[in-house]
């Protein structure tokens, strides 16, 4: 909570389930007697006892986002924000950004656009994660997210309607094939039917899209989160079963599987197809396919990792997660670095989301044109989509 003469500005920081090893540090108490070790009293104390007094004494205006973020980074002094915790720094950074917009008397998305030097704003295409697997779900499915992108919609409002209708058609398709309990939802609001074959998930999507009557307006995206099932240079597509190295497949075999998906289904975007350090596989794959290849665990919204990925031509789109890097200023830098190198950028939520809607304004202000913030289900996901609907009405 940040108070200025204009009122109260509040931010909440999300948390990820499948985190990349190069992400900024999320500071937890590790006191097993409280919240299973996941308490954040240390991070909160850093805000109240160190960061807040410093910002108040320096008397910097809340519109000076970069100055405030730089001050916090200097005070922390570590490479990955391990002293204060990225969760402490980001909470303040987000609240400052909201306060800055109010100080200027403009909507948050305009303030963000100003900070990024964008004269215009753009509404995004939503990527709805409607089938969940991987570390987000209790099924056997290895690949983490299967998304629908209503690229043929004329407006965000229409995109929401298409997404909702396909989602409910998918629910019926799954119920008919696997029974009612297969329609329980995963962390991000998507369904998590107990299937093993990743192709089966694509088949279910294709079916639901056709039933809803939108086969001409929707394309499919995937987030494989392959770092979660990388084993000794190979990949285990049945990683939730007892370990058996004989079933591991090579990066080339995995790449061929992706190519078969692209050939047989309208798959136009694949995120984290390989492990976060399997640079050779990324490079080879991106050069050989004409689709969007998104870096998440690979790039962790970190300008240094992005620069390496640009040099290596490892991918062609950045997944932007504010809590991977831990400040608004660095998030804008990461976005601009990617865009200036001709990459796409997709703004993203985390599996452990909050009701905070900052990323809805962020995606509009940064003009990235793409956002993924879950299925049209669960209010912490819908909060973001509803905020974009409101922004569209305003514009």
Swiss-Prot record:
Pathway the protein takes part in: Carbohydrate degradation; glycolysis; pyruvate from D-glyceraldehyde 3-phosphate: step 4/5
The cofactor named in the record is: Mg(2+)
Q: Any idea which positions bind substrate?
A: 136, 145, 271, 296, 348-351, 372
The active site consists of 188 (proton donor), 321 (proton acceptor)
Could you tell me what reaction this enzyme catalyses? (2R)-2-phosphoglycerate = phosphoenolpyruvate + H2O
Residue sites binding Mg(2+) per the record: 223, 271, 296
Q: Which CDD domains match?
A: enolase (cd03313)
Note the PROSITE patterns from the entry.
ENOLASE
Q: What's noted on cofactor binding?
A: Mg(2+) is required for catalysis and for stabilizing the dimer.
GO biological process terms held by the UniProt record: glycolytic process
Q: What is its EC number?
A: 4.2.1.11
Alphabetically, the GO molecular function entries are: magnesium ion binding; phosphopyruvate hydratase activity
Q: Which SMART domains match?
A: Enolase_C, Enolase_N
Q: Fetch the Pfam families from UniProt.
A: Enolase_C (PF00113), Enolase_N (PF03952)
Any idea where this protein resides? Cytoplasm
Q: Name one GO cellular component term.
A: phosphopyruvate hydratase complex
The main location class comes to cytoplasm
List keywords of the entry alphabetically: Cytoplasm, Glycolysis, Lyase, Magnesium, Metal-binding
Oligomeric state and interaction partners are given as: Homodimer.
NCBIfam families, per the entry: eno (TIGR01060)
The name of this protein is Enolase
Species of origin: Alligator mississippiensis
């Amino acid at each position: 909570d940040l108070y200025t003469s204009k009122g109260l500005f509040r931010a909440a920081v999300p948390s990820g389930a499948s985190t990349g090893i190069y992400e900024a540090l999320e500071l937890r108490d590790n006191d097993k007697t409280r919240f299973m070790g996941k308490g954040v009293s240390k991070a909160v104390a850093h805000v109240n006892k160190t960061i807040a007094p410093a910002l108040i004494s320096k008397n910097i205006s809340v519109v000076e986002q970069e100055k405030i973020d730089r001050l916090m980074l200097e005070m922390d002094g570590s490479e990955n924000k391990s002293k204060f915790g990225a969760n402490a720094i980001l909470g303040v950074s987000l609240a400052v950004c909201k306060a800055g917009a109010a100080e200027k008397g403009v909507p948050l998305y305009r303030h963000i656009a100003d900070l990024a030097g964008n004269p215009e704003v753009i509404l995004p295409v939503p990527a709805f994660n409607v089938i969940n697997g991987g570390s987000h779900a209790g099924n056997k499915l290895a690949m983490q997210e299967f998304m629908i992108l209503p690229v043929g919609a004329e407006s965000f409002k229409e995109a929401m309607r298409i997404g909702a209708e396909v989602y409910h058609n998918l629910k019926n398709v799954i119920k008919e094939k696997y029974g009612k309990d297969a329609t329980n939802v995963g962390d991000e609001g998507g369904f998590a039917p107990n299937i093993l074959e990743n192709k089966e998930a694509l088949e279910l999507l294709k079916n639901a899209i056709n039933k809803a009557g939108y086969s001409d307006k929707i394309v499919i995206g995937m987030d494989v989160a392959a770092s979660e099932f990388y084993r000794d240079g190979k990949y285990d597509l049945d990683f939730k079963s007892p370990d058996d190295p004989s079933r591991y497949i090579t990066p080339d075999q995995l790449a061929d599987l992706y190519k078969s998906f692209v050939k047989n289904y309208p798959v136009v975007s694949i995120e984290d197809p390989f492990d976060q350090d399997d640079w050779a596989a990324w490079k080879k794959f991106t050069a050989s396919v004409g689709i969007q290849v998104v870096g998440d665990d690979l790039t962790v919204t970190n300008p240094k990792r992005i620069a390496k990925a640009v040099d290596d031509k490892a991918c062609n789109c950045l997944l932007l997660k504010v809590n991977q890097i831990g400040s608004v200023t660095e998030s804008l830098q990461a976005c601009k670095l990617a865009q200036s190198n001709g990459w796409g950028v997709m703004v993203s939520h985390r599996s452990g989301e909050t009701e905070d809607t900052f990323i809805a304004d962020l995606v509009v202000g940064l003009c990235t044109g793409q956002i993924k913030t879950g299925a049209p289900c669960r209010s912490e996901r819908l909060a973001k989509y509803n905020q974009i609907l409101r922004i569209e009405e305003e514009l």
